[in-house]
Amino acid sequence: MAAASFITSLVTRLLRSAQSGRLHQRPFHLSAVRNEAVVISGRKLAEQIKQEVRQEVEEWVASGNKRPHLSVVLVGENPASQSYVLNKTRAAASVGINSETILKPASISEEELLNLINKLNNDDNVDGLLVQLPLPEHIDERKVCNAVSPDKDVDGFHVINVGRMCLDQCSMLPATPWGVWEIIKRTGIPTLGKNVVVAGRSKNVGMPIAMLLHTDGAHERPGGDATVTISHRYTPKEELKKHTALADIVISAAGIPNLITADMIKEGAAVIDVGINRIQDPITAKPKLVGDVDFEGVKKKAGYITPVPGGVGPMTVAMLMKNTIIAAKKVLRLEEQEVLKSKELGVASN
């Protein structure tokens, strides 16, 4: 029992260290004379995290363990998905993680895809596994996400990982919400007792962001201790404005260009833009990537702001790499085994 307790304690400390980001906080300053917000470079923060992962990977391999391996399943030929997958495999190579991309046609049946996932789940060479979303309409995305083994689920979409996150337990955190969390913590933006508005309630992004920010900072999986309001597509714009005007932190993950404008936020607020929208540039008539926030207008009033591109996007990829090394170390599996062992010992003693 003493050994089981020690291992469980060690596992908890490892995951809390990886997921809290508390050691990397910097002081939060809002200058009274600043004319514009500090633009947070997600690329620079992502490089910091990838350097940490790179060091962790090399230490893991130097200790006699096999190099971590990430398998990515890409269904169809969606250009955006192809670009995202390429970014992930490049990031894996940069931190010393082996990776493979398994290409399947859009015509693949749901059964065939589930069989492939099962095969990868049972492959001991595969540490991390993700299926790039979105999937063709004839395939149930929720069924696919739940088919991935929870301890290989580097996207953090499996219902077990979602449930553990909601219970403030250590789990594979969804990469984008975790990236937002790391931006906030590493920039030194305070959350304890602060008002936060999250625009967007998707189960993969908006909801987990709100969960990370409002939960108890003293729990197994530390949260932000903030007061969080979530808006969605049925929230009237004027009602949203009432909430954002009081918010210390505004996070937009709605997928609506110019949803958040300067008149909606208070002076010095931190604004995190998770939105990814492709629009036609009114000047060049070429495709342009923008977020949900009127960047030029809001940065004149906010204290901190993330750009699109170059903000949350690079952090998402970096957190995927973090999840992959966690998966390789079988941290969650070890914790689960110790819990089961403790239960078995308890039953035996009775």
Curated annotation (Swiss-Prot):
Its EC number is 1.5.1.15, 3.5.4.9. GO terms for biological process: tetrahydrofolate interconversion. It is found in: Mitochondrion. It catalyses: (6R)-5,10-methylene-5,6,7,8-tetrahydrofolate + NAD(+) = (6R)-5,10-methenyltetrahydrofolate + NADH; (6R)-5,10-methenyltetrahydrofolate + H2O = (6R)-10-formyltetrahydrofolate + H(+). Pfam families: THF_DHG_CYH, THF_DHG_CYH_C. GO terms for cellular component: mitochondrion. Keywords: Acetylation, Hydrolase, Isopeptide bond, Magnesium, Mitochondrion, Multifunctional enzyme, NAD, NADP, One-carbon metabolism, Oxidoreductase, Transit peptide, Ubl conjugation. The keyword Oxidoreductase applies. GO terms for molecular function: magnesium ion binding; methenyltetrahydrofolate cyclohydrolase activity; methylenetetrahydrofolate dehydrogenase (NAD+) activity; methylenetetrahydrofolate dehydrogenase (NADP+) activity; phosphate ion binding. Residues 1-35 form a transit peptide. There is a cross-link at K50 (Glycyl lysine isopeptide (Lys-Gly) (interchain with G-Cter in SUMO2)). NAD(+) binds at G200, R201, S202, R233. Its cofactor is Mg(2+). Substrate binds at Y84, V85, L86, N87, K88, V131, Q132, L133, P309, G310, G311, V312, G313. The modification N6-acetyllysine is found at K50. HAMAP family: THF_DHG_CYH. Homodimer. PANTHER family: BIFUNCTIONAL METHYLENETETRAHYDROFOLATE DEHYDROGENASE_CYCLOHYDROLASE, MITOCHONDRIAL, C-1-TETRAHYDROFOLATE SYNTHASE, CYTOPLASMIC-RELATED. This NAD-dependent bifunctional enzyme has very different kinetic properties than the larger NADP-dependent trifunctional enzyme and is unique in that it requires formation of an enzyme-magnesium complex to allow binding of NAD. Although its dehydrogenase activity is NAD-specific, it can also utilize NADP at a reduced efficiency. Belongs to the tetrahydrofolate dehydrogenase/cyclohydrolase family. This is Bifunctional methylenetetrahydrofolate dehydrogenase/cyclohydrolase, mitochondrial. It comes from Bos taurus (Bovine).
